[in-house]
Design a protein with these regions (language model features):
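A generic structural signal for tightly packed, nonpolar segments enriched in small/aliphatic residues
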Residues: 1-162
Length: 162
């Protein structure tokens, strides 16, 4: 990751550049696992609604552990694909990658594929694309800001690392 040139194709997707820097920095430490949580796209919210954060994971075991932990803690998540073919949409003629794509398809998956480029290939990685805002309250979950996915991640981390 010493020199990576990004084409800022979509100015409204600049936050993922900051997260890419953080993921690059985290990868330098060679951790076993990196989990990031961000309000990255509106596309994830459209896809899964207000009760579920979109979950992306490189490894099925990690995704399954997070989904299971979400069920146990009443903090459900929904896995969306890191479909490699969509990575073609991030290709740039003038840089190593684009920060987004110009079409209207698979916005959350393409954003996650962008982030995937900045995590060391040998590192297990999961990404929650969460809007973290609940438009209406329900028992145990008030209206307003909500840490969607946090309970699931915490439970999985405790199980995995003690």
């Amino acid at each position: 990751f010493d020199a990576y040139c990004d084409h800022l194709l979509v100015r409204d997707a600049e936050g993922r550049l900051i997260l890419a820097d953080a993921l690059t920095r985290a990868s330098e430490e060679k951790p076993e696992l990196v989990i990031d949580m961000a309000t990255l796209t509106g596309a994830a919210r459209v896809a899964v609604g207000p009760d579920l954060p979109a979950l992306f994971a490189r490894r099925d075991e990690t995704a399954e552990a997070l989904l299971r932990a979400g069920k146990i803690n009443d903090d459900p998540c929904w896995r969306l694909p890191l479909h490699e073919a969509y990575g073609e949409w991030l290709k740039s003629d003038i840089a190593d990658t684009n920060n987004a794509h110009a079409n209207a398809f698979a916005g959350a998956s393409v954003a996650a594929l962008f982030l995937d480029k900045f995590v060391g290939k040998d590192i297990d990685w999961a990404h929650f694309d969460t809007f973290a805002w609940r438009p209406a309250g329900k028992p145990g979950r008030p209206k307003g800001g909500d840490a969607l996915g946090l309970r699931a991640a915490w439970h999985m981390l405790r199980e995995r690392f003690g």
